[in-house]
Amino acid sequence: MNNPAMTIKGEQAKKQLIAAALAQFGEYGMNATTREIAAQAGQNIAAITYYFGSKEDLYLACAQWIADFIGEQFRPHAEEAERLFAQPQPDRAAIRELILRACRNMIKLLTQDDTVNLSKFISREQLSPTAAYHLVHEQVISPLHSHLTRLIAAWTGCDANDTRMILHTHALIGEILAFRLGKETILLRTGWTAFDEEKTELINQTVTCHIDLILQGLSQRSL
């Protein structure tokens, strides 16, 4: 029989190792050492082998953690999108609201300091993809990208399978990602010191304005 106290202790150790590994892998990629990861986690280096196996296995465990985290954050949006798509004629106001909510959620996540290591990890994988990226892509990025494409296509009357529609969706997502990947630029240009609640709301308003322009523009012209 499992000892509940030992099980809780083990889960805590795994969480600490994942958090430390995300920070180290995000900063150094696979050049990160298990010794530094264990030290940052406050764990014995043998704990990595015990809980995960090799360094490569720990790297994939980080990717799975990211997939689970993103999936949890956006699952309500995906489920609501499916309910909308199941309707014979989805309400356009509801479609727009769901697009805005998904984008607001992305902005919220990408302006928080505690998701920086996640962003670093994914950015490395975007530029030099490994099996870890494909894991995250298949489980959450591709489904969420597809849902947003379908929502935009449904509102504008465009074909969701058209490559140009996918590109328009990707460009919109890129506009939001710019506030994470280009964070230092916008802080210096605006004179801000950080993304607090007030600044994040201003970003939300700006992106909402752009989304409405994009939706109106695409609905009034061919792709």
UniProtKB/Swiss-Prot annotation:
Ranges of the DNA-binding region feature: 33-52
One Gene Ontology term, aspect cellular component: cytoplasm
MF GO annotations: DNA-binding transcription factor activity; identical protein binding; transcription cis-regulatory region binding
Keywords tagged on the record: Activator, Cytoplasm, DNA-binding, Repressor, Transcription, Transcription regulation
Phenotype upon gene inactivation: Mutant shows increased sensitivity to chloramphenicol and cefoperazone, a third-generation cephalosporin.
Keyword DNA-binding: yes
Residue intervals passing through the bilayer: none
Domain HTH tetR-type: 11-70
UniProt xrefs under InterPro entries: DNA-bd_HTH_TetR-type_CS, Homeodomain-like_sf, HTH-type_TetR-like_transc_reg, HTH_TetR, Tet_transcr_reg_TetR-rel_C_sf, Tscrpt_reg_YbiH_C
GO annotation (BP), single: regulation of DNA-templated transcription
Induction description: Negatively autoregulated.
Keyword DNA-binding assigned: yes
Alphabetical list of Pfam families matching this protein: CecR_C, TetR_N
Localization in the cell: Cytoplasm
UniProt xrefs under NCBIfam families: PRK11552.1
Function: Regulates transcription of the cecR-ybhGFSR operon and the rhlE gene, which altogether are involved in the control of sensitivity to cefoperazone and chloramphenicol. Represses the cecR-ybhGFSR operon and activates the rhlE operon. Acts by binding to a palindromic sequence within the intergenic spacer located between these two divergently transcribed operons.
Name of the protein this chain belongs to: HTH-type transcriptional dual regulator CecR
